[in-house]
Amino acid sequence: MSSLWAVADPHVAAQIEEAHQAAVQDALHFIERYALFSRQGRNGVRQVNVTGLVAAAFTHRDSRAGDPDLHTHVAVANKVQTFDGRWLSIDGRVLFKATVAASETYNTALEHHLHDRLGIRFTERVDGDPRLRPIREIVGVDPALNRRWSARRASIETRRGELATQFQRDHGRPPTPVEMLHLAQQATLETRDAKHEPRTLTEQRIAWHNEAAQVLGGRQAVHAMVHTALHPSHTLSPIIDAAWVAAAADRVLTALEEHRSTWQIWHVRAEAQRQIRAANLTTDKVDQLVDLLVAEVLNTRSIPLTPPDDTIVEPVPLRRADGSSVYTVAGADLFTSTRILEAERRLVATAGRTDGRTVDAVAADLALLEAVANGMALDAGQAGLVRSMATSGARLQLAIAPAGGARPQHYAPSPRRGWRAAGEYLRWPRPPPRPHSFANTLGRPPTHSPNSPGPSNTKTPNCPTGSTALAG
């Protein structure tokens, strides 16, 4: 969006900025409608409605690198007014849970406003990481221009890679997802340039036009790209009927099941927004359609895990605007699905079986001695873990240890011939350090984690953080 805004004529650029501001307002309206509450009573036991946000918005036109980056910061005051006139603090529990749903609301609203104003169409980027959620870009905007104006992100990613490499050298393992987040934050700060001298919008647009001409091969190519983006080929929007809603609700549920075992309304609402964008709908009833999909998924396709409310009916002063009790937390109900419960039952049944393949105890002891000779001595607990998992015959075993506890190393001394004879297959929930050396010790090629690139023919159920699953 920022690339097109930077090089389009002033009239079009103004409409793009208006669409952005309208999408920001839609996201704030979502927060006010669904996620903004305060707390009253002893220990804040009552969650109550408030009149709205008090906030200041600041729109920036570029990044620290000087690239076009139209974005708005919204500084929110922590005080809100309750319906009885008191000024109290925001209940951050719900606001935190709703962050991603608010972000997806902005994304959907932006596409909708740009299509209504300028006929702009979005599509999924073809070079995106298949392990991540798809990124949508404006049809007709040259990817080379987007890459040229992503200098800030490129510098962060480069530094993050360097920090991750250094982390692995220092700790003998790759960083966990949480640690990668901290490394990304560190990279963001370390690569943050000093603020450049202020430039007027006219000066910025002249500079951006020159840069775009260099990337695309001349000013005529820039004009042609803008024309293509503003006049995309038309696609037929699906007919919104009961069949479409049912199919979309099924897709929402499938996406939820692929990423989590339980969910709340915020997860459903965020995924519903993604499905509506992917369908390229032109309806002006997006909000109503999102609500309909959320209701379909939660009421007809999900199984509630939260115990039902008691039969006590509070008086009106103790109920929120939607009729719910002030003694409940909005959006806190947990749900799952039949498929998740069936998978859980299969795991439990498998965990009760002890007829799996085993390795001879003598072979396990010899492998441990071989590990000592090769400089990989294990302590008593680690050695016991290897013996137990190799010889127990249990169909499903779980090793729980702190992240970075070198769980994969415990399996490294497993006897080569024993594993080969037993036909065992090791599966790591996360990419282990030095996978090839472990595989060589086991006498077989390395397998792949579901979170790592590479071929894989099996799926591993979600495991607790800091755990390694072994199925026989």
Regions found by a protein language model. Name each.
Residues 1-472:
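Helicase P-loop NTPase motor core of nucleic-acid translocases
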